[in-house]
């Protein structure tokens, strides 16, 4: 859950609140639908079919199609590494630490975790800190004077300023912030490796639904918190982000900085696992050397890019918009595979479920195309 609400998601929600306030709440809540139905399909592929998405593409579409599908997977992983390193850079900035040296240290430690396969220990250490960051932001929101009537009448109203370039751009960014390509591979791969069966599907779907609702409620709370952050030239200032934790007074920057670094590091760990279950499965590679090569080819250039830029907020929001386009091949294969009798062991998605999946996927793509058009 926390891996899905990562630093880039938090930044996107804070920016949405700073720019549009209550009006972005409706967008966050409506995103429960595509988030649930897309992740539910990934969960079914792993639970009923027993396949990770990358593995299933290789098995049912062959080597060359799988190789082509691996490219957007790799781009997605690279972009996620960029987003997390950018978030960690903001954390270092808030703590007053040297950004380049700090990022280099994070890269070295993360590489050591990858090489030593100490994922579980890292998760146990970082998850509580990351969770506290989200809880702290939520707690800060409660101390502000929120107009409940405005939340209901404007925040939850389906009538919003669609067509406004800034609003539509942030719709695309929020879509990409919660429906991330690598999560499809992580979700399906995790369920298949846990050896879940069709009998476990009801509980698996319930967990996915609860996760989608909690994720978007948290995003909505963060949006409300973002209303109290000042913008500079249409973007929130990294130095002002700690205003989201005003409940901590003079310690806000320290708490936010530590939280950002921990949340970013946790996401790096999860992404490296998702990469193994996506690209390596699609390429039908299982060797340790292949995994290390893929990790270095994705993460090292991402680190370099973040070192070379300085507007981390703009970078992360742009990446969230790009996600909605990069995810297209993954959505296509996921929809086809979950409709395949053989792949799903005779229990594919029903026709109406398939129709809902494609409608939700189309909504993601339309949001992305709109966002990309606004960038160009």
Can you say where each PLM-predicted feature lies in the sequence?
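Transmembrane helix-boundary motif of multi-pass solute transporters/channels
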Residues: 1-31, 41, 236-238
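Flexible loop linkers connecting adjacent transmembrane helices
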Residues: 12-15, 40-65, 231-246, 342-348
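Transmembrane helix-loop boundary segments of multi-pass membrane transporters
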Residues: 14-15, 19, 54-58, 86-100, ...
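Selective recognition of specific alpha-helical transmembrane segments in multi-pass small-molecule
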Residues: 26-34, 38, 203-229
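Juxtamembrane transmembrane-helix boundary signature
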Residues: 27-60, 68-79, 226
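Transmembrane alpha-helical segments of multi-pass small-molecule transport proteins
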Residues: 68-71, 94-115, 132-136, 287-304, ...
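Membrane-interface loop-to-helix entry segments
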Residues: 105-106, 114-144, 320-327, 359
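Hydrophobic alpha-helical segments and their helix-loop junctions in multi-pass secondary transporters
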Residues: 131-159, 168-188, 333-342, 367-376
């Amino acid at each position: 859950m926390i891996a899905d609400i990562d630093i880039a998601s938090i930044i996107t929600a804070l920016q949405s609140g700073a720019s549009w306030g209550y009006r972005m709440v409706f967008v966050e809540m409506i995103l429960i639908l595509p988030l649930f139905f897309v992740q539910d399909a990934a969960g079914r592929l792993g639970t009923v079919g027993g396949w990770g998405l990358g593995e299933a593409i290789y098995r049912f579409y062959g080597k060359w199609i799988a190789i082509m599908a691996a490219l957007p997977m790799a781009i997605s992983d690279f972009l996620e590494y960029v987003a997390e390193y950018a978030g960690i850079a903001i954390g270092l900035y808030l703590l007053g630490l040297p950004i380049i040296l700090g990022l280099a240290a994070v890269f070295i430690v993360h590489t050591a975790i990858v090489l030593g396969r100490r994922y579980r220990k890292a998760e146990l250490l970082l998850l509580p800190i990351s969770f506290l960051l989200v809880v702290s932001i939520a707690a800060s929101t409660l101390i502000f004077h929120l107009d409940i009537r405005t939340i209901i009448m404007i925040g939850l109203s389906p009538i919003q300023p669609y067509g406004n370039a800034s609003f539509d751009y942030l719709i695309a960014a929020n879509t990409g912030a919660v429906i991330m390509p690598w999560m499809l591979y992580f979700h399906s791969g995790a369920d298949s490796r846990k050896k879940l069966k069709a009998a476990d599907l009801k509980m698996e779907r319930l967990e996915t639904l609860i996760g989608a609702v909690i994720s978007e409620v948290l995003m909505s709370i963060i949006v409300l918190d973002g209303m109290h952050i000042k913008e500079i030239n249409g973007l929130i200032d990294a130095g002002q982000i700690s205003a989201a934790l005003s409940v901590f007074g003079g310690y806000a920057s320290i708490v936010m900085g530590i939280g950002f670094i921990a949340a970013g590091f946790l996401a790096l760990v999860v992404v490296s696992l998702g990469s193994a279950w996506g690209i390596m499965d699609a390429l039908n590679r299982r060797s340790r050397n292949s995994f290390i090569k893929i990790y270095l080819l994705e993460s090292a250039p991402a680190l370099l890019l973040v070192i070379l830029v300085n507007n981390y907020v703009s970078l992360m929001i742009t990446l969230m918009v790009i996600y909605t386009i990069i995810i297209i091949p993954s959505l296509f294969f996921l929809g086809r595979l979950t409709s395949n009798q053989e792949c799903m062991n005779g229990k594919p998605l029903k026709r109406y479920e398939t129709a809902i999946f494609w409608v939700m996927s189309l909504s993601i793509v339309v949001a992305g195309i709109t966002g990309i058009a606004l960038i160009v």
